[in-house]
Amino acid sequence: YGKPGATRRLREIFEELVEQGAACLDLVTPTHFTDAVLEALGGERWPVPVVWNCGGYESAETLKRLEGRVQVYLPDLKYALSEPAARYSAAADYPQVARAAILEMYRQTGPFRLDEDGMLQRGVLIRHLILPQQGENTRRVIDWVGQTFAPGQVLFSLMSQYTPVGDLAQWPE
């Protein structure tokens, strides 16, 4: 249902951001726009990193299409355990899918690289949000990252800013 010329306009927006001094092109939750993003990026390398900022539940096939176009991946790794993944996200396979996706991201980028100002230019920054009453899940996420990657290969961000909202009665824990 997109508008004709929307991909051309997206490319113009990317160009405008670069001209205005953006440090990167940060594409947030872009998976459902993969085709348009790839067309807008074209085949050339951009003067700033292209960042794929996603929830981690990505197919390796989609990620392979991004190879050479995306320099930085910012995936969430929400769950290492299937039970909370099924309960809170209706995706019991989230741990397996996200791990495979992160491995593909790393295959593409290799070890992270910062510029002289400390800005990430290439690599994978894995984020994990600590959820209430999910300490074991968090420990398993940390264990997987630590056992899978050597120091200096990926960056890891442990976030604690979760704020529950909505109908909390359905989640007594």
Where are these regions (language model features)?
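Canonical Radical SAM [4Fe-4S] cluster-binding loop centered on the CxxxCxxC motif
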Residues: Y1-P4
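Glycine-rich anion/phosphate-binding loops
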Residues: A6-R9
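Conserved AdoMet/S-adenosylmethionine-binding subsite of the radical SAM
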Residues: F14-P172
